[in-house]
């Protein structure tokens, strides 16, 4: 690697870049980052990145133009001048992994990141440029800061409540049915807190994302914060395949088989996948983030939160079994799993795609997202929806630190919409507008997980096929091995 040339640059404030020792790069894969058609070697900058090295390492050998322009408040002033110090002469097309370093089953067949990832305009006349000016108003800045502080306080209170409820439940002080219902709501709320923390730089609290048995905080940094938010509703959006594996299961078997699949994740699968992530090497379908961090001598504390949460979840399961609370545990597991699964897939209408020719990224995001209403009280809906209720602001301002900040930002967004003649639709009601659409999708005929083409001629063939039985067995086994929706 041509490292020494780039290490001679000066960092922010005139200090030298904190480059890892030359020996640390020996044998490390060549890393490049593409921004606006230009290739850069940001390896010497990894230790200096204000958001920590993880966001950069997960996005290595990709076009990160969208992330640069949307995860920074003023990239023209703060980021683009800095990038010039790390420019490479290598053609950008040679720097991009065709599969973006993610498993192929998460992407459409024949996907090629060079040709299939979208590009957008980022000039001064765009919606995002106007929104940045609105967000810079002192009143808006103060409101967002106060909202973040309130969110953190409330998240801490919910975590304390969770500890109290679990202790009372496992001590047989609290009625099992009451505890189960409380845990379903608290797991959903804590996952909402983790959802916000995953977007924050260097926050171990992102592990709260895993409390609902659906999320996986380590892969969420990439699959959610980078790929989904950057490439919403395009072929590069891995969230569009969230239902993927289960759609190959016959509709009458789908709910119980997917439940067993996720139970396998809880018992062993998440742990297997985490160990795999921490040991895997860089390849076309893997980013090898932890392996590269070890090679470069960078800090490796990112997974402490994951192991703390997952040890807690398994201790709960073990103690519940010893205390004779298995049915109560199973009830809260199934309730948490399916409530949060339906919330995830209800946050976008994946069957109703907008105008893919739209070059204004923020306008496209507005067209492809919707807000959700459960009670009509925005802050309460944040917790009941796992942080998904104020969804339009979340997608337009992915760098914000909390769901409360998204609520506080809504007036600024609406002002820009009004000036541009863009309609601001009211939030969709979860019960009457969203769940019926999700239910139709959930109970659709079995189809190929990747292409979504029908697999059987009719419902009888779908449920009586030996091939279907074999698929169900393999799908459950995949959960035990940590393969599937994580």
Task: Explain the meaning of each model-derived region.
Residues 110-133, 159-165, 170-186, 193-197, ...:
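Long, hydrophobic alpha-helical transmembrane bundles and adjoining juxtamembrane helices/loops
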Residues 324-363, 444, 456-457, 461:
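Extended hydrophobic/aromatic segments used for targeting, binding, or gating
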Residues 2-138:
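B-type heme-binding environments
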Residues 125-144, 281-289:
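Membrane-proximal N-terminal segments immediately preceding the first transmembrane helix
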């Amino acid at each position: 690697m041509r490292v020494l040339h780039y290490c001679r640059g000066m960092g922010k404030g005139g200090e030298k870049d904190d480059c890892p020792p030359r020996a640390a790069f020996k044998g490390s894969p060549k890393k490049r980052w593409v921004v606006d058609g230009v290739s850069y070697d940001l390896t010497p900058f990894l230790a200096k990145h204000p958001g920590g090295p993880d966001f950069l390492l997960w996005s290595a050998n990709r076009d990160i133009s969208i992330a640069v322009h949307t995860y920074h408040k003023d990239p023209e002033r703060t980021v683009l001048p800095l990038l010039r110090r790390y420019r490479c002469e290598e053609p950008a097309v040679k720097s991009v992994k065709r599969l973006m370093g993610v498993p192929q089953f998460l992407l459409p067949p024949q996907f090629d990141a060079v040709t299939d990832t979208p590009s957008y305009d980022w000039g001064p006349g765009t919606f995002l440029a106007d929104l940045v000016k609105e967000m810079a108003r002192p009143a808006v800045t103060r409101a967002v800061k106060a909202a973040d502080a309130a969110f953190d306080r409330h998240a801490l209170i919910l975590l304390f409540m969770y500890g109290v409820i679990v202790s009372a439940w496992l001590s047989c002080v609290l009625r099992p049915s009451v505890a189960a219902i409380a845990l379903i709501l608290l797991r959903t709320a804590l996952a909402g807190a983790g959802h916000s923390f995953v977007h924050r730089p260097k926050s171990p609290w992102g592990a709260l994302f895993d409390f609902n048995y659906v999320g996986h905080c380590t892969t969420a940094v990439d699959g959610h914060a980078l790929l989904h938010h950057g490439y919403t509703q395009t072929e590069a959006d891995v969230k569009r395949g969230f239902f993927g594996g289960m759609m190959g299961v016959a509709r009458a078997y789908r709910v119980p088989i997917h439940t067993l699949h996720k139970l396998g994740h809880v018992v062993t699968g998440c742990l297997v996948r985490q160990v795999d992530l921490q040991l895997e090497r860089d390849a076309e379908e893997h980013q090898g983030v932890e392996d590269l961090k070890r090679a470069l001598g960078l800090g490796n504390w990112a997974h402490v939160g994951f192991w703390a949460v997952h040890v807690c979840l398994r201790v709960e399961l073990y103690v519940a079994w010893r205390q004779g609370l298995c049915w109560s545990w199973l009830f809260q597991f199934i309730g948490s799993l399916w409530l949060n699964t339906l919330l995830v897939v209800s946050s976008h209408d994946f069957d109703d795609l907008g105008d893919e020719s739209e070059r204004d990224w923020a306008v496209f995001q507005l067209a492809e997202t919707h807000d959700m209403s459960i009670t009509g009280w925005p802050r309460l809906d944040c917790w009941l929806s796992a942080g998904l209720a104020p969804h339009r602001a979340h997608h337009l301002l992915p760098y914000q630190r909390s769901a409360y900040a998204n609520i506080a930002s809504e007036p600024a967004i609406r002002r820009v919409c009004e000036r541009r003649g863009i309609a601001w639709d009211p939030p969709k009601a979860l019960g009457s507008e969203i769940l019926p659409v999700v239910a139709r999708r959930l109970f659709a005929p079995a189809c190929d997980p990747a292409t979504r083409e029908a697999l059987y001629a009719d419902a009888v063939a779908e449920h009586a096929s030996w091939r279907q039985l074999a698929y169900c067995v393999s799908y459950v086994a995949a959960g035990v091995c940590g393969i599937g929706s994580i």
